Amino acid sequence: MAARTDNSIVVNAPFELVWDVTNDIEAWPELFSEYAEAEILRQDGDGFDFRLKTRPDANGRVWEWVSHRVPDKGSRTVRAHRVETGPFAYMNLHWTYRAVAGGTEMRWVQEFDMKPGAPFDNAHMTAHLNTTTRANMERIKKIIEDRHREGQRTPASVLPTELHAQQLLLLAASGRLARIVHVLTELRIADLLADGPRHVAELAKETDTHELSLYRVLRSAASVGVFAEGPVRTFSATPLSDGLRTGNPDGVLPLVKYNNMELTRRPYDEIMHSVRTGEPAFRRVFGSSFFEHLEANPEAGEFFERFMAHWSRRLVLDGLADQGMERFSRIADLGGGDGWFLAQILRRHPHATGLLMDLPRVAASAGPVLEEAKVADRVTVLPGDFFTDPVPTGYDAYLFKGVLHNWSDERAVTVLRRVREAIGDDDARLLIFDQVMAPENEWDHAKLLDIDMLVLFGGRERVLAEWRQLLLEADFDIVNTPSHTWTTLECRPV
């Protein structure tokens, strides 16, 4: 069965600049981290052939191939395909550009099928292409936005302008936009538009809503690229709205719902309390900590665990479960939720066994997950609290996935020291799957999540230097070079 990837990013720059930079083939070695050479071979009426040559891969191998590319600036589209397909039965690419709030949206779709006997199947290649595409998009975005800023650095650019006012207005109104997206998510509009454009009257009938009111909400969402308005009040899907479809593994549907729950929304009314005191506003609003509230409210707790499981799946798709785990035979996942992440590691490495430790309410949900992955016979499930119960000994890898950012430095050091005591003199590794914040002035979702940590949990996101200091206090040293956003910090005891 054929495979497909679909990724997009918004570049804060005008279309002309985005188009010119991304379609300058001979400059691609600067844009794309994996390309060493790009050469245009021949040009015809509708396009051109060009050759790409990669930098050496992890095994020292260099790859090259010829593709045909047809750019159409008028329609803001590019179509391309590989002429020399290599391990692919075929590879087709479609790029589109669209003006949206905040700049130019650049969308890349790749459709392909692997040849029988190729070293990777469609699923592995899909995961690889998604990872490299997202990384390259972020790289290209930064290059173009840096060039755009350089071009704008005139005395006039520092004066208040209509553009600056509109951007600030959009930020100030973002709370309204979040509620609009949530309402459209609850109505499953993205699912209803999955098969093509529809009139608002049809959508209102299917969702049991007031037609004019639904139109006004959809019109507002379309103004920022979430759905697109067509003639006579029809609406269609967009790359942004596709992220709201049910079952989309690359979507953000659970995040939208999570951000609009009472337990995440109400504490933001008291954010000033957190800013003035450094304490989480959650306790001021609900009278307990976030996790105490989940224990007392099982329905909210179950949703939170489902939400965390969704992000576990995203991390596996992004390759974090493949970070050299073949080295380890006994793996302890501390705070591992329902065990899905650990199960994917064990499925990939049948020689290994695992331990899953989490609070009793959470650990109780692991059985079906481990059974479905066919690894239940290789996992010990240990209900417990790693702050108060003994951390198991005798493992050669200890994992924390999305756990330590929930806690203050003081609390995080406490649990890290308990892991260090459990390791003792063993030759074990601590693997932290978490976020490393990008440098100052760069967009990074972790910088928004850091405010969640402040307001809801009393935890924090960290830059690399802060991670190093935190781990040093617990007698660990980082031995790899972590990237930004979600990444792996591999630590050895010292």
Curated annotation (Swiss-Prot):
UniProt xrefs under Pfam families: Dimerisation, Methyltransf_2, Polyketide_cyc
Result, substituting R69 to A/D: Abolishes the production of the first ring
Annotated region described as Polyketide cyclase, given as residue ranges: 11-140
Catalysis: reaction(s): 10 malonyl-CoA + 8 H(+) = tetracenomycin F2 + 10 CO2 + 10 CoA + 2 H2O
Effect after changing Y35T: Strong decrease in the production of the first ring
GO molecular function, one term: O-methyltransferase activity
pH dependence statement: Optimum pH is 8.0 for methyltransferase activity.
Reported consequences of knocking out the gene: In the absence of TcmN, the linear polyketide intermediate formed by the minimal PKS consisting of the TcmJKLM proteins undergoes spontaneous cyclization to form some TCM F2 as well as SEK15 and many other aberrant shunt products.
Keyword field contains Acetylation: no
Family stated for the protein in its record: In the C-terminal section; belongs to the class I-like SAM-binding methyltransferase superfamily. Cation-independent O-methyltransferase family.
The protein's name: Tetracenomycin biosynthesis bifunctional cyclase/O-methyl transferase TcmN
Biological source species: Streptomyces glaucescens
Lineage: Bacteria, Bacillati, Actinomycetota, Actinomycetes, Kitasatosporales
